[in-house]
Amino acid sequence: MFRCRAFVLFALLLLAAPAAARAETPSNLAGITLGDAAKSYKGRLTIARERPVKNAPWMRRIPLKPDKYFSSGYVLVGTCAAPGRVARIKARYRDGSLDFFRRISGELLSRYGDPTEYKGELDGRIMGNKWGYIDPWTRPVSLIVQHVEGEDPETGAGNTIKLTNWGLLEAERACWQERHPAPARKKGPTGADHGYIPR
């Protein structure tokens, strides 16, 4: 039994080795590093414009200052487990063309290998790729690059890139929910289910 488990573990390590050898987990975007204190990036962020995130009180959003590569963007920082620490970085490239998107996608493919997921729509109005990693502390990290054609009211047109440490986001959510438990719901009388709800 031990030999079988050891063999399976060894086989999994061999399969994971090419992806791990290709590149380290990305942690920096637009000059900002995931997990760092946002206040240490006063030259890159507009700290005075920090705002709460709708439906996520465990996070706050701080705008990214435009530079020669990015026209806009933001970082999400924690409010509970690690207050002020950067958990997500999202930036919109100044060049919104499809050619630029293809060039960036090619560079990401050469650096990080094949994406783990396609992040687009079949009609081609939204195209994108997602890479998934595990950071040195075994927290999941994702990198998403997308191109949007036309004027989508939710995303806007152009090219965006987003780097997220899901472990940091989840730690913030769990901390906030532990400190702010949901009120207990009162059980009321159950109505007729008309036979379509299992009991």
Enumerate the language-model features and the residues they cover.
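Bacterial N-terminal signal peptides
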Residues: F7-A17
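Non-cytosolic coordination micro-motifs
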Residues: R22-P63, A91-R199
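Compositionally biased P/S/T/G-rich terminal and signal peptide-adjacent segments
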Residues: N55-P83
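Short secondary-structure capping micro-motifs at structural edges
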Residues: G73-V77, I89-D95
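Glycine-rich, often proline-containing surface loops adjacent to acidic residues and nearby aromatics
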Residues: A82-K90
